[in-house]
């Protein structure tokens, strides 16, 4: 699970080496703890949802609103989001996603018309985008929170399954050792009884 922190640290070092200023907003105690040793003075905010039983859009929106506020104050020009993408119970992929500026590229797999379509917007494009872009950011952050949560649960399931399997193997080995010891004790007692009977 620490691979995403390593990915974020590596990117931060690259940016610092070329003279860029880097700041972090951390989500979760472990993420903050792993980044604090090297980038403690660069952590500007921290969100802890460990007491939240069920993640909801509210948590994603809290983080997104903080990002939007900082962006509107011209505190940064690019925002990277780091999280673990859930592939399977055994596989979680550390992922980097640029959420500001907004990615406007069309997917190559999608059929795109050779000629750009002309649309009319009501209200105007600026009004629509000023409403949609913050919601889009909140959704992206919430989606990353859910992916990360699913990855965390998958990693826990795998760890618990491995621990259970190891415990079962240990119980089997201890049972065999106990049975051998018990058998040796019984055999020893039988030999003593037989030796005592022969002596009579």
Cite the ranges covered by each PLM segment.
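C-terminal beta-strand-loop-alpha-helix "lid" module of Rossmann-like NAD(P)-dependent dehydrogenases
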Residues: 3-200
